[in-house]
């Protein structure tokens, strides 16, 4: 048996295909989903989900959201998402470097909001680099 996996962002459907396995970045850690999984509703962290279709793994950068698992259907509603095979790795790495610089600057300021925004921007940039196949320091 396979899973029906849908990744839906406000502006588009990022993925809608069968898969054998899904690994999600839940707020409590990595969560693996196989056929026959118990019903589940979970919040998702900004990070990389992985979808196994056949022998291939496809990474998808998720920018937070929710996942529902029921009757071998995995529905993922996210703020934004991007398939790893469609991310320009060099651009993603440049965005990650810029986000690191922005975080360093924010840590020097007194603005709590600037720090929070910089951390979120760094998480998004890290997810994009990882989905594109790059390696980043954590």
From Swiss-Prot:
It is found in: Cellular thylakoid membrane. It holds the Pfam family ATP-synt_DE_N. Gene3D superfamilies: F0F1 ATP synthase delta/epsilon subunit, N-terminal (2.60.15.10), Helix hairpin bin (1.10.287.540). GO terms for molecular function: ATP binding; proton-transporting ATP synthase activity, rotational mechanism. Keywords: ATP synthesis, CF(1), Hydrogen ion transport, Ion transport, Membrane, Thylakoid, Transport. InterPro entries: ATP_synth_F1_dsu/esu (IPR001469), ATP_synth_F1_dsu/esu_N (IPR020546), ATP_synth_F1_esu_C (IPR020547), ATPsynth_dsu/esu_N (IPR036771). GO terms for cellular component: plasma membrane-derived thylakoid membrane; proton-transporting ATP synthase complex. The keyword Transport applies. The keyword Transport applies. SUPFAM superfamilies: Epsilon subunit of F1F0-ATP synthase N-terminal domain. It is a peripheral membrane protein. Belongs to the ATPase epsilon chain family. F-type ATPases have 2 components, CF(1) - the catalytic core - and CF(0) - the membrane proton channel. CF(1) has five subunits: alpha(3), beta(3), gamma(1), delta(1), epsilon(1). CF(0) has three main subunits: a, b and c. Produces ATP from ADP in the presence of a proton gradient across the membrane. This is ATP synthase epsilon chain. It comes from Cyanothece sp. (strain PCC 7425 / ATCC 29141). The lineage of its organism: Bacteria, Bacillati, Cyanobacteriota, Cyanophyceae, Gomontiellales. The gene is atpC.
